[in-house]
């Protein structure tokens, strides 16, 4: 996942949950400016921060990183 897509997802998750950047930064144990850089794509959260973010939003790391692949079960394949 690109920094830009992760940044957008972090922004969306925070806003949907009505959290402030200050609050999320506090949960992560970083200053607000660092968290702001995550949302703008200037920095990438480390592994520990990603786990904390997934826990905060009650989603898996795969969902956070958009690694989950939707499978279309209606597609048939000829052998």
Residues covered by each model-derived region:
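A short, Lys/Arg-rich alpha-helix, primarily the initiator
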Residues: 1-16
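Residues that mark the N-terminal boundary/hinge immediately upstream of a DNA-recognition element
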Residues: 9, 20, 46-49, 60
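Alpha-helical residues within the helix-turn-helix
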Residues: 15, 26, 55
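Residue-level detection of the helix-turn-helix DNA-binding "recognition helix"
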Residues: 15, 29, 40-42, 69
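Short alpha-helical DNA-recognition segment
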Residues: 18-37
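DNA major-groove recognition helix of helix-turn-helix/homeodomain DNA-binding modules
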Residues: 29, 48-63
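Short, charged recognition helix plus adjacent turn
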Residues: 65-79
């Amino acid at each position: 996942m690109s920094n830009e897509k992760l940044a957008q997802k972090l922004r969306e998750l925070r806003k949907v949950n009505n959290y402030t950047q200050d609050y999320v930064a506090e949960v992560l144990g970083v200053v607000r400016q660092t968290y702001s850089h995550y949302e703008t794509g200037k920095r990438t959260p480390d592994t520990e921060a990603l786990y904390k973010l997934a826990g905060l939003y009650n989603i898996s790391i795969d969902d956070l990183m958009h690694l989950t692949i939707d499978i279309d079960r209606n597609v048939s394949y000829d052998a």
